[in-house]
Swiss-Prot record:
Function per UniProt: Toxin active against insects (S.frugiperda larvae). May act on sodium (Nav) or calcium channels (Cav).
Signal peptide bounds: 1-19
Protein name: U1-sicaritoxin-Li1a
Lineage of the species this protein comes from: Eukaryota, Metazoa, Ecdysozoa, Arthropoda, Chelicerata
Disulfide cross-links: 37-54, 45-59, 53-72, 61-70
Free-text tissue specificity from the UniProt record: Expressed by the venom gland.
Entry's Gene Ontology cellular component terms: extracellular region
Family under the similarity heading: Belongs to the neurotoxin 28 (Litx) family.
Lineage: superkingdom: Eukaryota
Molecular function GO terms recorded: ion channel regulator activity; toxin activity
Alphabetical keyword list: Amidation, Cleavage on pair of basic residues, Disulfide bond, Ion channel impairing toxin, Knottin, Neurotoxin, Secreted, Signal, Toxin
Amino acid sequence: MRFLVGAVLVVVLVACATAFESDAETFKSLVVEERKCHGDGSKGCATKPDDWCCKNTPCKCPAWSSTSECRCAMDCSRRCKGKRALLLPVETHRLLFPEQW
C-alpha cells in the first residue's frame, strides 16, 4: 500500500512539473509575440511608455490586447534592470528572460 501511494505521488509530481513547464513555454510565447501599437492616445503607446517599463523603450501592444490596452512590451534595457516588462513580477521576468539578468 505504501508503495502504491508513493508511486501515485511521484506520478502526480511529474505531471505537475510537466504542466508547469508547458504553461511557462506557452506564456513565454505570448509575451514574446507582439504587434505594433497604432498609437495616438492608446494607453502606454507612442508618446508615453508604460510606467513599469524603462523610459525611451519602444512600446508595442501584446498580441492578446486591444489597442486601448497597450503596454510596453519590449524588454527593458540592461541599465533599467529590475524594472518590469508587461507588468510581470520581477521573479517571473527573471525566469522567462534569464539572459537579461
